Amino acid sequence: MVDVLNIESLDLEARGIAHRDGKVLFVEGALPGERVTVQTVRRKPSYEIAKVEEILRPSSQRVAPRCPHFGVCGGCAMQHLAPAAQVAIKQRALEDTFWHVGKLKPARILPPLYGPTWGYRYRARLSVRVVPKKGGVLVGFHERKSSYVADMRECHVLPPAVSRLLLPLRAMIAAMSAPDRMPQIEVALGDEAIVLVLRHLLPLTDGDIAVLRAFAAEHGVQWWLQSKGPDTVHPLEREHADALAYTLPEFGLRMPYRPTDFTQVNHAINRAMVSRALKLLDVQPQDRVADLFCGLGNFTLPLATQGREAVGVEGSKALTDRAHEAAARHGLGERTRFATLNLFEVDVQWLRGLGYFDRMLIDPPREGAQAVAQALSLLAPGERPRRIVYVSCNPGTLARDAAIMVHEGGYALRSAGVINMFPHTGHVESIAVFESLDEATVLQAQAQARQKAREEAERLAEAAAA
């Protein structure tokens, strides 16, 4: 059945949203404001998924996708939408999530942070598959919503130097001893090097090593090898062990890293994000600052250039060790301290044990920082950070944690905005600023939270006894 629909909005999977007979329809390939004919491909009791058959009235924000693989490759979802419109949709999604999850509205919306629209992806995981029906080896991202590897010949979100490697990598893998046992190549670009990490399930032969070295010499890349888990990753050539690094020129910092370490995908936006975070945090020379989920010290070291002391906390000792080394190399060893701790299991006593912080930066993974938010909400007015900047890659967990800090802890959500870290995708990176309110308001919020918790415990006890 073919329907004619008016598209009302867009979700973060870049599907148009329409309604018909009280049912929601998610329409692949449609944009807000468009009138389209669609074919339903999946029916559920409360919604349907459809695809566009014909665009009867196109959106003024529709643009021609640059990539010939768009729509098949799962690496991008929004190339058919103007970049400014992509950011506007992400900003609306952030605001909607704050309200629906946390019943919160930021007092101020920060202007979006923009960066390069193309060639920005300095870190990527490429899958490798042998597919005889498609001519042999494929190297690229998965197809959209599929486990199949897309038949990619170019990629415009990868830097051009990496995009040009896609076809040569196919030929290289095909020339090796066991191409069907090499499932993955990770890409990591530093400011001065391109590193490729080959995942191989069988030992490499001398011939394989020769092929890798010839490829590296021809294309100007460096190979690292991974035979099992992350701890087996090592450079093919020993002299390449310290080649990868990114810079934060505003703070005079060079940050070395390993190719499988977490670093931000978009180096240009990372520089802008660090700069904005520190401006929002407004660190003073006498301030002691915490950086939770600090990783390699992406924020910790810049913070140490401005405050009295920066304390980085992270769950991986390997990362905190390297952050400490980087701080020492920059002469920041006496102004930094690092601790290894699982931040998903902390409590208020642990937080008190670290001492008083004037400011705090939180930059968690997608799971958010619920335990940290709960601990912060329990701190007394005189023992809590006055200002907190929270950098998030998941609006849902940010809104959840914000609700705890505001409704239970007496913080105010002063401002929030999006960071266009991942153009053409549905990923939403954002930043939010919280400030502790006056003592009376904090104590009132904490008392109300305790009362609500008691009432909920009584309700559960009554339900269990019934």
From Swiss-Prot:
Reaction equation(s) it catalyzes: uridine(1939) in 23S rRNA + S-adenosyl-L-methionine = 5-methyluridine(1939) in 23S rRNA + S-adenosyl-L-homocysteine + H(+)
Q: Report domain TRAM positions.
A: 1-54
Question: EC no.?
Answer: 2.1.1.190
Give the UniProt keywords, A-Z: 4Fe-4S, Iron, Iron-sulfur, Metal-binding, Methyltransferase, rRNA processing, S-adenosyl-L-methionine, Transferase
Record InterPro entries = 23S_rRNA_MeTrfase_RlmD, MeTrfase_TrmA_AS, MeTrfase_TrmA_CS, NA-bd_OB-fold, SAM-dependent_MTases_sf, TRAM_dom, U5_MeTrfase_fam
Residues annotated as binding S-adenosyl-L-methionine are 264, 293, 298, 314, 342, 363
Top EC class of this enzyme: transferase
Species in which this protein is naturally found: Bordetella bronchiseptica (strain ATCC BAA-588 / NCTC 13252 / RB50)
What is the similarity comment for this entry?
Belongs to the class I-like SAM-binding methyltransferase superfamily. RNA M5U methyltransferase family. RlmD subfamily.
Is this entry keyworded Methyltransferase?
Answer: yes
Task: List, alphabetically, the Pfam families matched.
Answer: TRAM (PF01938), tRNA_U5-meth_tr (PF05958)
| Biological process annotations from GO | rRNA base methylation
GO terms assigned for molecular function: 4 iron, 4 sulfur cluster binding; iron ion binding; RNA binding; rRNA (uridine-C5-)-methyltransferase activity
- Residues of the active site: 393
Q: Where does [4Fe-4S] cluster bind?
A: 67, 73, 76, 155
Q: Which cysteine-cysteine pairs are annotated as disulfide bonds in the entry? A: none
Question: What is the protein's known function?
Answer: Catalyzes the formation of 5-methyl-uridine at position 1939 (m5U1939) in 23S rRNA.
Name listed for the protein in its UniProt record:
23S rRNA (uracil(1939)-C(5))-methyltransferase RlmD
